[in-house]
A protein has these predicted regions:
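N-terminal catalytic cores of NTP/NDP-binding nucleotidyl/phosphoryl-transfer enzymes
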Residues: 3-12, 16-79, 194-227
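Secondary-structure transition/capping motifs at alpha-helix termini
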Residues: 16-19, 48-56, 82-89, 217, ...
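Conserved short loop/turn motifs at secondary-structure junctions
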Residues: 28-32, 60-68, 91-100, 123-124, ...
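Active-site cores that bind ATP or allylic diphosphates and position pyrophosphate for catalysis
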Residues: 63-65, 71, 108-270, 328, ...
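A glycine-rich helix N-cap at a beta->alpha junction
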Residues: 73-100, 105-106, 113-116
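Core subunits and conserved enzymes of cellular information-processing
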Residues: 230-234, 238-240, 304, 308-311, ...
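Long, charged, mostly alpha-helical binding arms that flank functional sites
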Residues: 250-327
Length: 552
């Protein structure tokens, strides 16, 4: 549930004053790309506030720009909201559903002398408006056309008599305003492109700043909450509402975007990464997209926990991605069952163990006491095992507590073994490690009371499965990608080690039944999930630990 913040304070005041009786919010993404972690903040705010106040939450696909939108993105957005558990109880709508009403309201403004058809080009219009708020503006030569002439031209625009850019419908507001958005903004433009829902019915389309408040009002939205870059657009939002509907609601309010380290949120950049083949699609586990995070192994709970901890304010800030990692790590530590995986295997042969024998040890699925999981599983033990290469050293460094020549170590959940010899390949690399097991230590400590400090994991060579394990890291080396030097190429900051593929890994055989969406802790290694696209591949969700301390 949403915490108290400045947005809920506004809503509380509106309810207390009797201005509204039911809260109605919406999430209005443009279907021209995939949702990302920043989108999750907007979803969470609108969905959770509606939930908190027993109100309604709409999903509206803002498909008013036919050139960039498509069903692929529409379907992905709906799927992402469902996955997050933020299903819109108020319904799913499309901006294009309101094209007829938008057109009628545009004609209303024209008839009232509040809108006019302009012949200036985009560049001329910008120059006449003053280019920026610090320069004076001057009226278009076409500003004083009569309502009758404007209505005729607007209808001819709709009929397809003019080329793109030849005519534009502008609101007649205030050319002297210090707010550029009120200097007679464009509210309709000509665009010859097939719409994914409307086909070729329309060749004129409403601008976002005109369509958005109309859509909000028609749907009964009470609080139109959007990101901070729309704050200067609020006076125009209010102008549209007042001049078309004559009401005080909907009310637009703004919050700061969610910016995260070591990634980019720009749809243009993300699309470029996909189209150039730098990443494996929009759902590449390194991407900040929700489908990418899902494939990586993140959960809806961890994402919404991260958004809530990041806070809701009007101040821009940069959130360390390690805070997101901390959220999923805390969750999986309690929920993920433990399994054994050897990523860089070397053969360990227990010489005093029968070749034809297979023994099964009961191993805890989750030894974390807070998980309250008392279940166990059977893990096969045989004469030949696989252990991690790094868990053996012929010449150990100081404080090395794993297996050494002549040294002892505990095989996790099984016997204590002592290394007796090593077989080597012609190039000097280790082919196999030989050891003997203290066969009296399968269920406890040595009878003579000797202490064995090291414990390593292992899998049976005869009862394991082969897999590829992908170790994912941050996509960019630069923490603040919004602050890279002007003119530099963001791709120069790509992390060359953002994914390391480990092949020939040996995994506990119980993982043969694992499905995409399942989460596991590979003991001593990290948290992993089966890849949804490639059978036999596991993706690292997050490492076991990190020095980062999340904000409280």
């Amino acid at each position: 549930m949403a915490d108290k913040n400045f947005l809920t304070d506004i809503i509380d005041a509106d309810l207390a004053e009797g201005k509204i009786r039911e809260i109605h919010t919406r999430f209005p993404p443009e279907p021209n790309g995939y949702l990302h972690i920043g989108s999750a903040k907007a979803i969470y705010i609108n969905w959770s506030i509606a939930n908190q106040y027993g109100g309604k939450f709409n999903l509206r696909l803002d498909d008013t720009n036919p050139a960039r939108e498509g069903e692929e993105y529409v379907n992905s957005i709906i799927e992402d909201l469902h996955w997050l558990g933020a299903d819109p109880n108020g319904g799913i709508f499309y901006g294009s559903d309101y094209f007829d009403q938008c057109y009628e309201y545009a004609e209303k403004l024209i008839k009232e002398g509040k809108a006019y058809v302009d012949d200036l080009s985009r560049e001329e219009m910008r120059e006449y408006r003053g280019a920026d708020a610090g320069k004076p503006s001057r009226p278009s030569p076409y500003r004083d056309r009569t309502p009758e002439e404007n209505l005729d031209l607007f209808r001819r625009m709709r009929a397809g008599e003019f080329k793109e850019g030849e005519k534009t419908l502008r609101a007649k507001i205030d050319l002297a305003s210090p707010n550029m958005n009120l200097r007679d903004p464009a509210i309709y433009r000509i665009k010859y492109a097939e719409h994914h829902r409307q086909g070729n019915k329309w060749c004129i389309y409403p601008m976002y700043d005109f369509a958005h408040p109309i859509q909000d009002a028609i749907e009964g939205i009470t609080h139109s909450m959007c990101s901070l870059e729309f704050e200067n657009h609020r006076p125009l939002y209010n102008w549209v509402i007042e001049n078309i509907f004559g009401t005080a609601f909907p009310k637009q309010r703004e919050f700061a975007r969610l910016n995260m380290t070591n990634t980019v949120m720009s749809k243009r950049y993300l699309r470029e990464l996909v189209e150039m083949g730098i990443v494996d699609g929009w759902d590449d586990p390194r991407m900040p997209t929700l489908c990418g995070l899902r494939r990586r192994g993140y959960t809806p709970t961890s994402i919404f926990t991260f958004v809530r901890e990041a806070g809701i304010s009007k101040s821009d800030n940069l959130i360390d991605m390690r805070q997101l990692e901390a959220c999923i790590r805390s969750e999986l530590d309690l929920t993920a069952q433990r399994r054994i995986a050897v990523l860089d295997p070397v053969k360990l042969i227990v010489d005093n163990y029968p070749e034809d024998k297979t023994e099964y040890f009961d191993v805890a699925n989750n030894p974390n006491r807070e998980a309250n999981d008392t279940t166990t599983r059977k893990v096969a033990f045989t004469r030949e095992l696989w252990i991690e290469n790094e868990d053996f050293a012929e010449v150990p460094p100081p404080k090395f507590k794993r297996l050494t020549l002549g040294g002892e170590v505990r095989l996790m959940g099984a016997y204590i073994v002592k290394c007796t010899s090593v077989d080597k390949n012609p190039d000097g690399s280790i082919a196999a490690i030989h050891c003997t097991a203290d066969l009296e230590t399968g269920n406890g400590n040595p009878a003579d009371g000797r202490k064995v400090k090291g414990t390593i994991h292992w899998v049976s060579a005869a009862r394991c499965i082969d897999a590829e394990v992908r170790l994912y890291d941050k996509l960019f080396t630069e923490a603040n990608m919004n602050a890279i030097p002007e003119g530099s190429d963001y791709k120069d900051y790509l992390n060359p080690e953002s994914v390391v593929a480990c092949t020939g890994c040996k995994l506990e055989e119980s993982l043969k039944d694992a499905k995409p969406g399942d989460k596991f802790q590979f003991v001593r290694t990290g948290f992993f999930t089966p890849d949804s696209k490639n059978p036999g591949v596991y993706n690292r969700v997050v490492t076991l630990r990190d020095s980062f301390k999340p904000a409280k």
